Every structure is written in C-alpha cells, then in structure tokens.
Amino acid sequence: MLYTPRFIYSNLTAGQFVGGEETKAGLAGAADISLFYEQDFDARGLNNSTLRAGLCISNMGNKMSYSSGTLRRDFLPTNLKLGLGYEMDFDGYNKLTVNGEINKLLVPTNPIYATDSMGRIIYNEAGDPVIESGRNPDVSVPMGMIQSFYDAPGGFREEMREIIWSLGAEYSYRNLFFVRLGYFHESQYKGNRQFLSVGAGIKYSVFGIDVSYLVATKQYHPLANTLRFTLNFDFVSANKNEIKQQGRLR
C-alpha cells in the first residue's frame, strides 16, 4: 500500500480579469492511495507465471477555485484506476505479458436542467436551477466520489460510458528486446479517444529506449500518427552493478 500526499498550485489565469472579476491562483491539497498485489504460481507448459493486480485512487483533495469573489469551487479530477496483468514465462527467455485497465472519474456528472419554451433554465423559489434528470452536483468531495457511480442523467448506460478501458500485450526476449501492442477506448459521448498503439524497446545494461506509434481509429483525430520516444535509466540495476564491482575490488 502506498500513500502519496501532494500540494497543488495552479496559476492558469495569471491574475486576468474574467467577467469583471479578478482571478487568482488555485490552491489545493490532495493525495493518492495505491494498492498492489503480485503472486507467482506454476502453470502447465510454462517455466513460471505471475498474476498482478493494482488499484489507485488519485487526486483526492479539496475543491479548487480561481476566483476569490465566487462561491463556486470545482472538484479535482479524482480518478479510480483498476489494473490486472498476467505474465507468462515460457522458457526463461521468452515472456508474454497481457494487461487490462479501467479508469473512472470520481466526480459528479453534470445533470440536465429543466428549461422553458425559450430554452432558458428554470429556477425554483430558492434560486437554484431545477434538475430534470440526474443529481445535484453541489456536494462534498466524499459524497461526490460516492455519487459519481449513480448520478449520470442517462442512468446505468451513461455510467458505463464513463468508464475508460484499455488492453495491452508485451512480448520480451531475455528482458532485452520488447514488442508491444495496445488499445485505448473512451466512449464517443465522453471524449471519443480511441486508438491503437504499437511499440518496441531495447534494453542494454542500465539503459533502455522505447518507441511507440499511435494509430487513431477515427479520422481527423488529434492523436493520430503520434510518435513517442522514451529513454530509461535503471537506478536499481546501476546500484547493484556498483556494489558488485566494489565487492570484486575488495
């Protein structure tokens, strides 16, 4: 289990006036909670196999505002992530790992407000907008996290659309050469990010380089044809090598 606190300072507006009101930097305190489980076990036809599972709730914190003159405060993008992976070691040289992951924002979904014949929002006697479908999003942070599982105006179907899921597979040879394939899916009604990714990687000693290419499944997608390069340095392996060298010198 891992607990990670953080302090957030966000100065997006740099003191500009919006709607006649001066903006300010947003401040918030937040934290992440992570759980990880790993279990090795024997499987027929395999040298070894490993099952991994993880859970992370990130950005749990107080609401943030960019204006001192308004009572409106916005939720941080609190997110729930669940992951499951299975690694198959065939002979000590060839490995195949399959992973799955789902993500869901733990913030209230905006309701549908009642409107009149002119399309104007209807307000009740207290001055609050009348909600036609969904639930009131003006709740506390803990209540907002709980409410996010059942407050969508479209009911259960819309709640399912709010879940982002992804799948991935990696083949490795002697932990030196890697080939990867993945798919990311977000509902067309909740952002419409959908793409395939292919990649490869090479590791030499404590250094590694990875390259990936995004193939969008929709035309005119902003992420289409994105090429990424990543350079890695393994500090743990570097320390182990240094300890071994010191032992030999002695």
Predicted regions mapped to residue ranges:
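Outer-membrane beta-barrel porins/channels
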Residues: 1-250
